[in-house]
């Protein structure tokens, strides 16, 4: 997010709805969905390596760390091992191929979420540098928020929610109050109710957090300062 606007450079509020969109999920050619056959791409744009290229070349331990750190997937070691074993004799080129491999690492009983959900999220987040981009977006928004301005973030993944929470609280817990940017912060996350989920099932994982900007001078907050040491 780069500023284009008046010389005052102040905004009363920002709303971030982060992550992949329904249009991207519903297009099998983008490779984001584990429920539709498509090329294993997962890139937000056409730059950089695809998910298929990443999976083909990454070391098993690195893949396990990636799935665990970016997806909070407890079975990451088993999944990584299964993927590496499969790719010895086969290329993994499609979304359903990867989803089937991941699914085979779980018991036959099914859960509320598809077994491949966290693995797909982890690969997508890593591939598109989404955590780094989110941190940059939070910093940019905080820089241009006016005193009393609201910053509202809707996230869909625990690692994103943790980053947002740590950003809003930064300076309060470590007593570096001069760098704390928000004087009012709703600590309790807001989630969709049953009626909202019935209307839009994809909202079931949504979490809304918001905070109100104080008068302190902006100072950029690094990802490592928020407790993130990612692969």
Q: Could you say what each language-model-derived stretch is?
A:
Residues 1-231:
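S-adenosyl-L-methionine-dependent methyltransferase catalytic core, i.e., the SAM/SAH-binding region
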């Amino acid at each position: 997010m780069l500023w284009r606007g008046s010389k005052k450079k102040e905004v009363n509020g920002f709303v971030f709805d982060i992550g992949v969109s329904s249009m991207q999920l519903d297009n099998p050619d983008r490779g984001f969905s584990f429920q539709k056959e498509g090329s294993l791409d997962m890139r937000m744009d056409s730059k950089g390596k695809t998910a298929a290229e990443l999976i083909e070349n990454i070391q098993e331990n690195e893949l396990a760390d990636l799935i665990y750190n970016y997806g909070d997937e407890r079975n990451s070691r088993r999944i990584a091992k299964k993927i590496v074993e499969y790719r010895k004799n086969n290329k993994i080129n499609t979304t359903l191929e990867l989803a089937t491999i991941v699914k085979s690492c779980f018991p036959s009983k099914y859960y509320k979420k598809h077994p491949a959900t966290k693995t797909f999220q982890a690969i997508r987040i890593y591939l598109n540098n989404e955590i780094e981009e989110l941190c940059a977006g939070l910093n940019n928004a905080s820089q241009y928020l006016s005193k009393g301005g609201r910053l509202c973030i809707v996230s869909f993944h625990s690692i994103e929610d943790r980053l947002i929470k740590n950003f809003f609280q930064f300076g309060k817990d470590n007593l570096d109050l001069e760098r704390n940017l928000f004087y009012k912060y709703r600590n309790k996350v807001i989630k969709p109710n049953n009626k909202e989920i019935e209307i839009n099932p994809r909202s079931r994982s949504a979490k809304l957090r918001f905070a109100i900007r104080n008068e302190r001078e902006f100072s950029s907050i690094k990802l490592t300062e928020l407790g993130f040491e990612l692969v």
